[in-house]
Amino acid sequence: MATYFDTQAARARSGAMPRLRIATWEGFMTEILVVYYSRKGSTAELARQVCRGIDSVPGAVAKLRTVAPVTAESEGPAKPVPSSGPPYVTLEDLRRADGLVLGSPTRFGNMAAPLKYFLDCTSSLWVSGALAGKPAGVFTSTQTLHGGQESTLLSMMLPLLHHGMYLVGLPYTERALNETRGGGTPYGASHVSGPSDEPSLSDHERALAQALGRRVAALAVRLVEA
């Protein structure tokens, strides 16, 4: 028996719920949304590397967005507009995307509150099934090697599963995953920052972040063209 999300995905494929596509001189592009939260820059640098991987896939284009910080006094965003960097993500960004990659530093083994707050506001997309049948991946950064990378990546996967998305990880056929002595997991890309406040990804961490972007984008292109 077809589930609710199967029905919604079928409607999207049939044209009953048309997706808006990005038009370029080369034609229509498959859009992959990369959403992250970062305080000191490590997760932001991972996000940029994920975007590089996405943009290397023919027919795919990356769209980089961040989330607003959350104040201690209330659960609302601290500022309506970021002072620098990518714009804040909107629900419309999420609805239009053909794929999604989420990133957050760890907070005691979980995703950071600003990203969790944004995901908690996506109920309307869950009701409509707007994300069902789309590929997604996750990435994180920690200060120490055993600082909670895997559990943080898993915490970001849970809302994506509720939305009916296809999770994409990193296989051990990626050479960097076997050779890394820092970040990098089968669950997603990661970075170990150490005590430095300056983001400095290793070659393996950079390669795996790009590989994650390529894998999500390649699957999204296939699904869109199916």
Could you say what each language-model-derived stretch is?
Residues V67-A72, G164-S196:
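Mobile beta-alpha loop/short-helix "lid" or hinge segments that flank ligand
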Residues S42, L100, S104, N110, ...:
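Gly/Ser/Thr-rich helix-start
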Residues A132-G182:
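Short, glycine-/small-residue-rich phosphate/pyrophosphate-handling segment
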Residues M1-F28:
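N-terminal amphipathic/basic-hydrophobic helices that include classical n-h-c signal peptides
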Residues I22-A130, V192-A226:
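N-terminal beta1-alpha1-beta2 submodule of the flavodoxin-like/Rossmannoid cofactor-binding fold
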Residues D120-S123, V127, T144, H162, ...:
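Alpha-helix boundary/capping detector
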Residues L154, P186, D203:
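Glycine-rich phosphate-binding loop at the start of an alpha helix
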